[in-house]
Design a protein with these regions (language model features):
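Bacterial N-terminal signal peptides that target proteins for export
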Residues: 1-7
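Basic/polar N-terminal segments that are highly enriched at the extreme N-terminus
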Residues: 1, 19-20, 160-161
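N-terminal signal peptide c-region/cleavage motif recognized by signal peptidases
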Residues: 15-17
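Low-complexity, intrinsically disordered Gly/Pro/Thr-rich segments
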Residues: 133-144
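Central antiparallel beta-sheet cores of small beta-barrel/beta-sandwich binding domains
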Residues: 23, 30, 36-118, 122-128, ...
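Short, functionally important structural connectors and interaction interfaces within domains
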Residues: 6, 20-21
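Hydrophobic helical h-region of N-terminal Sec-dependent signal peptides
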Residues: 8-12
C-alpha cells in the first residue's frame, strides 16, 4: 500500500501547479513583465519610473532580460540583464548599466542583488516574489560614498500567459 500512496501523492503534486512550482527568478522573468516604482532622489521631487521587459532563459540557464526604462524628463533607456545561478541560491551576472558584476542570492522568495552603476553609485536591490510567482515587490537603495542618495519602491508584474 505504501508505494501506491506515495505514487498518488506525487501525482497530485505534479498535477497541481500551485504546489509543484515554487517561485523562481527564472520563471518570473521568462516572458513579459511590466514594472512601476517611485524614485526618491535626495533633495529632489519623487518621480515615477516605468519599465517593460522581455525575458528568456538560454540553454546554459542564463536568464536574459531586455528592459526599456522610462523616467519623466529623461530619454528612454534600454538595458540588458544576464543572470545565472552559479550554486544553489547564488546568482551572478551582468547589467549593461553597471560596471562590474551583479552578485545576488535567492532565498525565501527574495532575490537580493548588489551591483555598481557606471557612475559609481552602488545599488542594493530586493525583489520579493509573491507566492503565486506573478508579481514582485521591488526595493532599491542607491549609495554614493556610503550615503543613501536615492531609493525606489515599486512592483513588477508578469504578463498573464
Amino acid at each position: 500500500m505504501f508505494p501506491r500512496t506515495l505514487f498518488a501523492v506525487a501525482a497530485l503534486l505534479l498535477a497541481s501547479p500551485a504546489l509543484a512550482e515554487t517561485p523562481s527568478p527564472e520563471r518570473f522573468f521568462d516572458g513579459e513583465t511590466t514594472g512601476t516604482g517611485t524614485l526618491k532622489v535626495m533633495m529632489s521631487k519623487a518621480k515615477t519610473l516605468t519599465d517593460r521587459g522581455t525575458g528568456r532563459t538560454e540553454r546554459d540557464g542564463t536568464v536574459v532580460l531586455d528592459q526599456i526604462v522610462e523616467e519623466p524628463g529623461a530619454p528612454t533607456r534600454k538595458r540588458q540583464w544576464r543572470l545565472r545561478q552559479t550554486a544553489p541560491g547564488k546568482i551572478e551576472g551582468t547589467l549593461s548599466d553597471a560596471k562590474g558584476p551583479v552578485i545576488g542570492e535567492f532565498a525565501n522568495n527574495v532575490l537580493h542583488m548588489r551591483y555598481t552603476m557606471k557612475d559609481g553609485v552602488k545599488v542594493e536591490q530586493w525583489l520579493r516574489l509573491s507566492p503565486d510567482g506573478q508579481q514582485a515587490a521591488n526595493r532599491m537603495v542607491f549609495k554614493k560614498y556610503g550615503m543613501t542618495v536615492a531609493t525606489l519602491e515599486g512592483s513588477v508584474r508578469r504578463k498573464a500567459r
